[in-house]
């Protein structure tokens, strides 16, 4: 009898009109329960409804995801602002509608879908399942789909889009985010991530296609449709072949006595890094056994982000000591970023920052270009790029060596987009990076790539070893030649969007309305650039050269003492990040003095501009 009552209750819940007192919420509840065919996420909403948890229902159902610096990204679970079966179907329907409008040959060229190894039992949600549903929506509309038959590194998707001449592609991943998250990363036909206006237009199309179409839930199409193709072997072979373009010392690599440890952080990277090492002539790197295989719980690390440093590299470093390996390489879970560490003579580990690795990459890629360039190659056609919050070291190298350096807004989508423009104009791009350990060596992939970066660092270390030089020693040589660049990057957590907004609005109206600060503590400010509003005091017309980015907060201060500091919000996480760098000329070699000056300025920046105690900000814990 009790079972029948429960059944009746569920039946009534499913079909009754909802009277929460909020018409918008009532409509959203009805839509969710009609459209969602995933029993677990449907049950999550039903339970909230049954328990009268209207605030949480409103939070989950009365807003939608927007495109950040890496596409759509959110927690997995039930709701229109979460990543789940229904929202991925809706997103893909919007993609289909937009692509059909943009490409008359969409149904000839097709679409690429890849995925990482994330998953969540409570919502029956995994990257693989979401990839299958993405494919199903398109297959049901007679679009050829290149669906990878197993997990792949994120860079394989943009690479495949280019090589297969597809109109676009999607990678289901949340990269290095916490285990609860997942994402939907979109690449255009060029192989670069989408930028405006495509992101806004796709969102409009998603909002016009929220009700699942007939066939959108039919993931059996992945097994039965003749339009489904598996590009894995072909793309892996071609990717590894293209890696040879940035391998310059294969014979030397094959003879090196250096040993390398690699960790894939419970993600996709192991097999692909092993293959890349083989292409470069190396013996296989030693894998960290506890982290080699996919694990969506990331059970051996407190967070799956190698950027967090020594605290998350513990297993790798201990294994390297045991195996007498001097260099540790860590790819993040979707293998698009790379961290590196080197054992020093004093027995301590040097974990390189993204900016320090970029200094080494910049030196290496230009040095290899000089030694291997064709007779008529002109240095004036050579470019390197970085995001505006990253170190200015490439700018210093470019000024001395004669090549071009350019900055973009944060996010590799801007770098990829600019590289396309440069390549179309006959320019050569050697290297690009963002300080958050994202590196691009060569232009086979127009996105950051941890697999290629890992093997390039190995070759660099192997080459330097023949001259008895360590990576750390070479970094010092780079700074001695081009000028010391001492940087610090960190963040505060803030879960209250109104607080974040008020912090930045205060800076825009500091001493009086529409007046930015002229000092930070005792440090005089020369220039202010605010790309959120498009203001730049260093320009004659006071307008920022970088594109306006109204969807995120970002203000950069240039100080009289040569320091550049930026405050910005994260596009993927609830963080306020700060970036600060002292840029010195080569004759300023007192690093202790530079570091002390930088520390004082950062302390002033935090105390005067962020005010963590007053604003309830949570300090980064490492």
UniProtKB/Swiss-Prot annotation:
Pfam families, alphabetized: PGM_PMM_I, PGM_PMM_II, PGM_PMM_III
InterPro entries in UniProt: A-D-PHexomutase_a/b/a-I (IPR005844), A-D-PHexomutase_a/b/a-I/II/III (IPR016055), A-D-PHexomutase_a/b/a-II (IPR005845), A-D-PHexomutase_a/b/a-III (IPR005846), A-D-PHexomutase_C_sf (IPR036900)
UniProt KW Magnesium keyword: yes
Any one Gene Ontology cellular component term annotated for this protein: cytosol
Catalytic activity: (2R)-3-phospho-glyceroyl phosphate + alpha-D-glucose 1-phosphate = alpha-D-glucose 1,6-bisphosphate + (2R)-3-phosphoglycerate + H(+); alpha-D-glucose 6-phosphate + (2R)-3-phospho-glyceroyl phosphate = alpha-D-glucose 1,6-bisphosphate + (2R)-3-phosphoglycerate + H(+); (2R)-3-phospho-glyceroyl phosphate + alpha-D-ribose 1-phosphate = alpha-D-ribose 1,5-bisphosphate + (2R)-3-phosphoglycerate + H(+); 2-deoxy-alpha-D-ribose 1-phosphate + (2R)-3-phospho-glyceroyl phosphate = 2-deoxy-alpha-D-ribose 1,5-bisphosphate + (2R)-3-phosphoglycerate + H(+)
Residues annotated as the enzyme's active site: 175
GO biological process: glucose metabolic process
Phosphoserine modification, residue list: 175
Keyword annotations: Carbohydrate metabolism, Cytoplasm, Disease variant, Glucose metabolism, Intellectual disability, Isomerase, Magnesium, Metal-binding, Phosphoprotein, Transferase
Residues that, per the record, bind Mg(2+): 175, 332, 334
EC number assigned by the record: 2.7.1.106
Disorder association: Neurodevelopmental disorder with hypotonia, dysmorphic facies, and skin abnormalities: An autosomal recessive neurodevelopmental disorder characterized by severe developmental and speech delay, dysmorphic facial features, ear anomalies, high arched palate, strabismus, hypotonia, and keratosis pilaris. Early obesity and seizures may be present in affected individuals.
Protein family according to the UniProt entry: Belongs to the phosphohexose mutase family.
Protein name from the UniProt record: Glucose 1,6-bisphosphate synthase
Gene: PGM2L1
């Amino acid at each position: 009898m009790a079972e029948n009552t429960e059944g009746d209750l569920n039946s009534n819940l499913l079909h009754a009109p909802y009277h929460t007192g909020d018409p918008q919420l009532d409509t959203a509840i009805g839509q969710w329960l009609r459209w969602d065919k995933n029993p677990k996420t449907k049950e999550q909403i039903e339970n909230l409804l049954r328990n009268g948890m209207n605030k949480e229902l409103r939070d989950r159902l009365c807003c939608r995801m927007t495109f950040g610096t890496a596409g759509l990204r959110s927690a997995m679970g039930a709701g229109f602002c979460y990543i789940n079966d229904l929202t991925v179907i809706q997103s893909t329907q919007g993609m289909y509608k937009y692509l059909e409008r943009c490409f008359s040959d969409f149904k000839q060229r097709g679409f690429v879908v890849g995925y990482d190894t994330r998953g969540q039992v409570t919502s029956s949600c995994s990257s693989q399942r979401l990839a299958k549903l993405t494919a199903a929506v398109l297959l049901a509309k007679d679009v050829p789909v290149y669906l990878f038959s197993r997990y792949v590194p994120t860079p394989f998707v943009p690479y495949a889009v280019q090589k297969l001449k597809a109109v676009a592609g999607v990678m289901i991943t949340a990269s290095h985010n916490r285990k609860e998250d997942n994402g939907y990363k979109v690449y255009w036909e060029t192989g670069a991530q989408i930028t405006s206006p495509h992101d806004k237009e796709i969102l409009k199309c998603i909002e016009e296609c929220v009700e699942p179409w007939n066939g959108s839930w039919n993931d059996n199409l992945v097994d039965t449709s003749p339009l489904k193709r598996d590009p894995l072997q072909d793309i892996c072979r071609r990717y590894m072949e293209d890696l040879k373009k940035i391998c310059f010392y294969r014979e030397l690599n094959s003879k090196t006595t250096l040993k390398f440890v690699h960790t894939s952080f419970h993600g996709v990277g192991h097999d692909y890094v092993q293959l890349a090492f083989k292409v470069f002539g190396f013996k296989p790197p030693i894998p960290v056994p506890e982290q080699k295989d996919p694990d969506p719980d990331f059970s051996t690390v407190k967070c799956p982000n190698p950027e967090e440093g020594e605290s998350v590299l513990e297993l790798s470093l201990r294994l390297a000591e045991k195996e007498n390996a001097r260099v540790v390489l860590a790819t993040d879970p979707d293998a698009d970023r790379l961290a590196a560490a080197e054992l020093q003579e004093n027995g301590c580990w040097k974990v390189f920052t993204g900016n320090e690795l970029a200094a080494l990459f910049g030196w290496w890629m230009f040095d290899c270009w000089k030694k291997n360039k064709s007779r008529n190659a002109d240095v004036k056609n050579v470019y390197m790029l970085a995001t505006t919050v990253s170190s200015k070291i490439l700018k210093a190298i470019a000024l001395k060596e004669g090549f071009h350096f350019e900055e973009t807004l944060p996010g590799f989508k801007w770098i990829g987009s600019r590289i396309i423009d440069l390549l179309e104009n006959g320019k050569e791009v050697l290297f690009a990076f963002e300080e958050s350990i994202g590196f691009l060596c060569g232009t086979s992939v127009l996105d950051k790539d941890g697999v290629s970066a890992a093997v390039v660092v190995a070759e660099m270390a192997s080459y330097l070893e023949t001259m008895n030089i360590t990576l750390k020693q070479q970094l010092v040589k780079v700074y001695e030649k081009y000028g010391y660049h001492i940087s610090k990057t960190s963040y505060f957590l803030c879960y209250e969007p109104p607080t974040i907004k008020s912090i930045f609005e205060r800076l825009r109206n500091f001493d009086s309305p529409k007046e930015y600060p002229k000092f930070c503590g005792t440090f005089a400010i020369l220039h202010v650039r605010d790309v959120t509003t498009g203001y730049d005091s260093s320009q004659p017309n006071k307008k920022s050269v970088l594109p306006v980015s109204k969807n995120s907060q970002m203000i950069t201060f240039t100080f009289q003492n040569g320091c550049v500091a930026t405050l910005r919000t994260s596009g993927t996480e609830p963080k306020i990040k700060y970036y600060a760098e002292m840029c010195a000329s080569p004759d300023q070699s007192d690093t202790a003095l530079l570091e002390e000056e930088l520390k004082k300025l950062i302390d002033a920046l935090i105390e005067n501009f962020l005010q963590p105690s007053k604003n309830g900000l949570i300090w980064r814990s490492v």
